[in-house]
């Protein structure tokens, strides 16, 4: 999907230079990486849940996820240090743009009662996070092939210095923010 990268170069960079007064096109903020995370809490009782979630995440992102292990034991959660409890994928380059295109144009419109993503989910340093309640919004996932519905956290890391710059960058790329 060269679509978003071309849009960034041809439309976003000139618009950002006009709005924020950048002298150099290289100073314009860009998307650095996208991190997709799934917490698999049921992996404590059901070790096969990690494989199922990993398969779904690999299909969605096109990249094999890293298994995240518990850093410390927590007795109330029946959790031991070193147990697999989550999955993470860091997307950069072409896969990152392909995933972002798919998220904006295919997945988010399929979310039930979707009216736009929250404009308040910036972290103060120009990064944006959003959560999805189910992996079924991605067209590659078939309802019959999944063992259970899982949510995921998506963090878009940008080189923007402020939230205002990052919001403008994502809005110009097509992210549907609530009005």
Swiss-Prot record:
Keywords: Ribonucleoprotein, Ribosomal protein, RNA-binding, rRNA-binding, tRNA-binding. InterPro entries: Ribosomal_uL5 (IPR002132), Ribosomal_uL5_bac-type (IPR020930), Ribosomal_uL5_C (IPR031309), Ribosomal_uL5_dom_sf (IPR022803), Ribosomal_uL5_N (IPR031310). Pfam families: Ribosomal_L5, Ribosomal_L5_C. The keyword Endoplasmic reticulum does not apply. It comes from the Bacteria. Gene3D superfamilies: 3.30.1440.10. GO terms for biological process: translation. One of its GO terms (cellular component) is cytosolic large ribosomal subunit. Transmembrane segments: none annotated. One of its GO terms (molecular function) is tRNA binding. Belongs to the universal ribosomal protein uL5 family. This is one of the proteins that bind and probably mediate the attachment of the 5S RNA into the large ribosomal subunit, where it forms part of the central protuberance. In the 70S ribosome it contacts protein S13 of the 30S subunit (bridge B1b), connecting the 2 subunits; this bridge is implicated in subunit movement. Contacts the P site tRNA; the 5S rRNA and some of its associated proteins might help stabilize positioning of ribosome-bound tRNAs. NCBIfam families: PRK00010.1. Part of the 50S ribosomal subunit; part of the 5S rRNA/L5/L18/L25 subcomplex. Contacts the 5S rRNA and the P site tRNA. Forms a bridge to the 30S subunit in the 70S ribosome. HAMAP family: Ribosomal_uL5_B. This is Large ribosomal subunit protein uL5. It comes from Dictyoglomus turgidum (strain DSM 6724 / Z-1310). The gene is rplE.
């Amino acid at each position: 999907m060269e679509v978003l990268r071309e849009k960034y170069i041809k439309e976003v960079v000139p618009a950002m230079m006009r709005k924020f007064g950048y002298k150099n096109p290289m100073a314009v903020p860009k998307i650095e990486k996208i991190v997709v995370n799934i917490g698999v809490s049921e992996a404590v009782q059901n070790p096969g849940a990690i494989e199922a979630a990993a398969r779904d995440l690999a299909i969605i992102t096109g990249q094999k996820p890293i298994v995240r292990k518990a850093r410390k034991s927590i007795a109330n959660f029946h959790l031991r240090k070193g147990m697999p409890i989550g999955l993470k994928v860091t997307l950069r380059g072409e896969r990152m743009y392909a995933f972002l295109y798919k998220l904006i144009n295919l997945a988010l419109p399929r979310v039930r009662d979707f009216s736009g993503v929250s404009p308040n989910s910036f972290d103060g340093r120009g990064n944006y996070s959003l959560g999805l309640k189910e992996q079924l919004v991605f067209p590659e996932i078939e309802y019959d092939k999944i063992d259970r519905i899982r949510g995921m956290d998506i963090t878009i890391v940008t080189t923007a210095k402020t939230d205002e710059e990052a919001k403008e960058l994502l809005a110009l790329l097509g992210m549907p923010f609530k009005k």
